[in-house]
């Protein structure tokens, strides 16, 4: 998803 929280949870 394209959410503001998704950008912060991009720890792959």
UniProtKB/Swiss-Prot annotation:
Membrane-traversing stretches: none
UniProt key word Signal: no
Cysteine-cysteine disulfides: none
Record's signal peptide: none
A GO cellular-component term linked to this record: ribonucleoprotein complex
Key words of the record: Ribonucleoprotein, Ribosomal protein, RNA-binding, rRNA-binding
GO molecular function, one term: rRNA binding
Function statement: Protein S19 forms a complex with S13 that binds strongly to the 16S ribosomal RNA.
Family from the record: Belongs to the universal ribosomal protein uS19 family.
Protein name listed in UniProt: Small ribosomal subunit protein uS19
Lineage: Bacteria, Bacillati, Mycoplasmatota, Mollicutes, Acholeplasmatales
């Amino acid at each position: 998803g394209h959410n503001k929280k998704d950008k912060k949870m991009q720890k792959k």
